[in-house]
Amino acid sequence: MKDLRHYDIIISPVITEKATMISEYNQVAFNVAPKATKPEIKAAVEALFSVKVKAVNTIIRKGKVKRFKGIVGRQSDVKKAIVTLASGQSIDVSTGL
């Protein structure tokens, strides 16, 4: 069942060269909410895409310090999830963009 909380957990798919390379290993990358846990990410992907998830790995990329016109600012931290799907399952993230 699709719950509105699932849409808050999965922010967007990651579409980079490296993310397309891991699709050979039946994996998909998503930007997720910073406070999302692995079980929440697994439940959200299974509910939204109707697939079976084998494993979830998460990465937190720390935000960089940037300067703009002499003012120092900081980019936000980003949490990324690498979702491994069960064999025979697939998600096409290029559709619906």
UniProtKB/Swiss-Prot annotation:
Taxonomically, the superkingdom here is Bacteria
Q: Give a yes or no for keyword Ribonucleoprotein in this entry.
A: yes
* Keyword Ribosomal protein among UniProt keywords: yes
Query: What biological-process GO terms show up in the record?
Result: translation
Question: A GO CC term?
Answer: ribosome
Q: Give the record's keywords alphabetically.
A: Ribonucleoprotein, Ribosomal protein, RNA-binding, rRNA-binding
A Pfam short name: Ribosomal_L23
Q: Which GO terms describe its molecular function?
A: rRNA binding; structural constituent of ribosome
- PANTHER family xrefs: 60S RIBOSOMAL PROTEIN L23A
Q: What does this protein do?
A: One of the early assembly proteins it binds 23S rRNA. One of the proteins that surrounds the polypeptide exit tunnel on the outside of the ribosome. Forms the main docking site for trigger factor binding to the ribosome.
Family assignment?
Answer: Belongs to the universal ribosomal protein uL23 family.
Oligomeric state and interaction partners are given as:
Part of the 50S ribosomal subunit. Contacts protein L29, and trigger factor when it is bound to the ribosome.
Q: What is this protein called?
A: Large ribosomal subunit protein uL23
Species the sequence originates in? Bartonella quintana (strain Toulouse)
The gene for this chain is: rplW
